[in-house]
């Protein structure tokens, strides 16, 4: 039970990133009602595909990664494609996290050189300190994540306590100024429910216990959905649609949103609470993603090359590439992040649907089977493909632009 609680918080902590705070800017022209329905729909899709991995793991050892699952049903081609996509995606995410973590840490460190030197030092300190928990093992990640998660939630509750008394019912009734904005916002909210790269680590940590993994996924993603709802309720209730649109014109960033809420609540505490939350959200997301990457590399080496690398070696392979990209070639991970939605859709939607399709043909009587037949699998697959094509339609001018 203790591991199940920890796994649940890892699921929620991985999803609830610092980007959550700026999500109301994405939904600024949509209104609360449409935003809530969109969030619930995308939560349902991505929780469904996460549970497909639970079903799949009944046919494999508890310590194998997604690449080995893909190889089990699609041969070495499946392993190569799935592993390559997952590793590139997670490397790009970690590079972004260490870059962001370094920027936050730089303000706290004593001056030891120019700004560029201080940034490099801060990135290294951030990576070494929090990366050490990854190297030690999932148990240590579980422990620190619990502490960080509860402090993060405390900061979040403080922000809500300052905002909720000031919400206006009329603001909550705002309708979309353009229905096409709902479509444009879908990819941003879609990736906000991503934690699928951490599922192999959680399954291994829970010793392949199907019930515990299901609980961790359902409750962890449910906590995330509830947090997203409360934040959207608070911001959409506090700010009118016209005020949102003014923020988009003047400063379409989290700072712009915080400044607007500060003017209404008249509480300087809110800015500090938001900073604490965003910092801890970045760290908990970093922990979940890095743990998933380390386990992915371990699975690749063990299953493909029969190399049983130690945790320190795996840690170096996990963190050196993204740190180098972050410090010396940031354009590289920024380019990769430009295709983050497509890579995420592949391993969070396309891959589990394809694997379960084959697995059910080979293993028709598994003890646990996710609800829904082939029609639902096809529907989810089509939705995933459509959502990932939306950014291209926005760039081509067929859909309106949204922040995110």
Go through each PLM region and give its residues.
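Select transmembrane alpha-helical segments in multipass membrane proteins
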Residues: 2-11, 75-89, 176-186, 263-281, ...
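Hydrophobic transmembrane alpha-helices that form the core helical bundles
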Residues: 48-59, 63-113, 275-299
């Amino acid at each position: 039970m203790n591991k199940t609680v920890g796994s649940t918080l890892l699921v929620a902590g991985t999803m609830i990133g610092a980007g959550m705070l700026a999500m109301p800017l994405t939904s600024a022209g949509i209104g609360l009602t449409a935003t809530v329905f969109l969030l619930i729909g995308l939560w349902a899709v991505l929780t469904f595909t996460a549970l497909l991995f639970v079903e799949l793991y009944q046919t494999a050892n508890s310590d194998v990664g997604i690449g080995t699952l893909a190889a089990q049903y699609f041969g070495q081609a499946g392993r190569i494609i799935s592993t390559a996509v997952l590793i590139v995606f997670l490397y790009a995410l970690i590079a972004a996290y260490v870059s962001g973590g370094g920027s936050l840490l730089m303000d706290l460190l004593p001056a030891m050189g120019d700004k560029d030197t201080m940034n490099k030092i801060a990135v290294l300190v951030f990576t070494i300190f929090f990366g050490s928990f990854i190297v030690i093992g999932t148990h240590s990640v579980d422990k620190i994540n619990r502490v960080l998660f509860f402090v993060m939630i405390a900061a979040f509750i403080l922000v809500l306590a300052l905002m909720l008394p000031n919400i206006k019912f009329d603001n909550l009734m705002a309708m979309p100024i353009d229905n096409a904005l709902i479509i444009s916002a879908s990819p941003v909210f879609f990736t906000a429910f991503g934690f699928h790269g951490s599922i192999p680590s959680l399954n291994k940590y829970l010793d392949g216990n199907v019930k515990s993994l299901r609980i961790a996924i359902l409750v962890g993603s449910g906590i995330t959905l509830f947090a997203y709802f409360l934040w959207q309720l608070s911001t959409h209730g506090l700010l009118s649609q016209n005020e949102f649109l003014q923020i988009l014109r003047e400063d379409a960033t989290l700072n712009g949103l915080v400044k607007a809420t500060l003017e209404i609540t008249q509480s300087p505490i809110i800015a500090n609470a938001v900073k604490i939350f965003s910092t801890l959200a970045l760290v908990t997301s970093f922990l979940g993603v890095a743990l998933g990457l380390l386990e992915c590399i371990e699975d690749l080496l063990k299953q493909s090359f029969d190399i049983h690398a130690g945790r320190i070696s795996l840690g170096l392979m996990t963190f050196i590439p993204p740190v180098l990209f972050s410090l010396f070639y940031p354009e590289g991970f920024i380019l990769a992040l430009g295709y983050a939605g497509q890579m995420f859709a592949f391993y969070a939607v396309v891959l589990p649907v394809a694997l379960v399709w084959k697995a059910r043909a080979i293993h028709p009587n598994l003890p646990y089977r996710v609800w829904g037949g082939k029609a639902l699998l096809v529907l989810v697959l089509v939705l995933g493909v459509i959502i990932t094509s939306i950014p291209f339609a926005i760039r081509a001018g067929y859909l309106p632009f949204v922040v995110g």
